[in-house]
């Protein structure tokens, strides 16, 4: 009895899909596996002509029959008879009727490949168009990188400041090998006079007003008291090298410059003598209410232990003579 297609139930099943464990005709194979790119990856093969349950592994050229691995050894024993066998490899994707005929030209009859409906090529073309549209989305996303300079999220302010301040010769005449380092004076660490960086700050303010870019307060902290204006001067600039990370560190965070320390308010609370006395009183009250060591759990054992004789603190066994002379112990 011929196996029928599991999808339509009317046509003869010729294809076996291992992923779906389904027997399909040629038309249903195209319709099912052209739905999305995931179904195109399913590996399919011809259906065994003997058992109609497993995919074919070989094609016997002498008997012109396609067999699975089990039917090859049990039903026909083509290997033992010395028949010419052709190995059949599974296929994927959705080949057109012309391509399908080329794949199984030596296996299927020409009348079988003609059973495929003519609209199968149209479905494959629509699927290719769908795949092409997905690549266009990626192309549009990559084109956004060309317009990144128009977004206000990123600014070229550090580079402009570097170009403006590069001609000031801030580090001219500085020899770090011989210069004494003084970390106590924040204004004069390298043992020379304070560097003039007012031009950089003036240009930074003018650049901010012209371009109307709202810089966060972290880049320009409020200067109060004896706080020194921070400079983006790194050791790499002294040697002639440049690095993008040199301009990310703008100095001390404003959280350490403005306001009181968060831990100063808790100092008085932890050393308050009144709270300490109240805690000691609560501890003594709980200690006086403890029952550990005062409760007799086994009254009968205690009564017997009080009457038993002891030698050096240990009980004397029953039946033994009790001879104890304290003078001998001394």
Swiss-Prot record:
Nucleotide-binding is among the record's keywords: no
Binding site for Zn(2+): 5, 8, 28, 33
GO molecular function: DNA-binding transcription factor activity; zinc ion binding
Signal peptide extent: none
InterPro entries: CCT_domain, CONSTANS-like_Bbox1, Znf_B-box
Domain of life where this protein originates: Eukaryota
Metal-binding as UniProt keyword: yes
One of the Pfam families matching this protein, by short name: zf-B_box
Keyword terms of this UniProt record: Metal-binding, Nucleus, Repeat, Zinc, Zinc-finger
GO cellular component: nucleus
SMART domains: BBOX (SM00336)
Main location: nucleus
ZnF B box-type span: 5-47, 48-88
Protein name: Putative zinc finger protein CONSTANS-LIKE 11
Organism field: Arabidopsis thaliana
Upper classification of the organism: Eukaryota, Viridiplantae, Streptophyta, Embryophyta, Tracheophyta
Gene (UniProt): COL11
């Amino acid at each position: 009895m011929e196996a029928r297609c599991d999808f339509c139930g009317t046509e003869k099943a010729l294809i076996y899909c291992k992923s779906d464990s389904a027997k399909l005709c040629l038309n249903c194979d195209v319709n099912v596996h052209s739905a999305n790119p995931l179904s195109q990856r399913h590996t399919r093969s011809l259906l065994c002509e003997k058992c109609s349950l497993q995919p074919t592994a070989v094609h016997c050229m002498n008997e012109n029959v396609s067999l699975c691995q089990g039917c090859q050894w049990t039903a026909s024993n083509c290997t033992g008879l010395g028949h010419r066998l052709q190995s059949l490899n599974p296929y994927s994707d959705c080949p057109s009727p012309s391509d399908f005929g080329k794949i199984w030209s030596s296996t299927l009859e020409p009348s079988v490949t003609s059973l495929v409906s003519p609209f199968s090529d149209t479905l494959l073309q629509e699927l290719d168009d769908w795949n092409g549209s997905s690549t266009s989305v990626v192309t549009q996303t990559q084109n956004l990188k060309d317009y990144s300079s128009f977004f206000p999220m990123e600014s070229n302010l550090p580079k402009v400041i570097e170009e403006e301040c590069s001609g000031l010769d801030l580090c001219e005449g500085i020899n770090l090998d011989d210069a004494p380092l003084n970390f106590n004076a924040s204004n004069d660490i390298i043992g020379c006079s304070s560097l003039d960086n007012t031009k950089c700050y003036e240009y930074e303010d003018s650049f901010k007003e012209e371009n109307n870019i709202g810089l966060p307060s972290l880049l320009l902290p409020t200067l109060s008291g004896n706080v020194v204006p921070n400079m983006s001067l790194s050791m790499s600039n002294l040697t002639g090298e440049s690095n993008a990370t040199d301009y990310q560190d703008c100095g001390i965070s404003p959280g350490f410059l403005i306001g009181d320390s968060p831990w100063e308010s808790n100092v008085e609370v932890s050393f308050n003598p009144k709270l300490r006395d109240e805690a000691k009183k609560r501890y003594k009250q709980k200690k006086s209410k403890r029952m550990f060591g005062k409760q007799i759990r086994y009254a009968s054992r205690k009564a017997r232990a009080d009457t038993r004789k002891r030698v050096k603190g240990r009980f004397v066994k029953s039946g033994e003579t009790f001879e104890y002379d304290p003078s001998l112990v001394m």
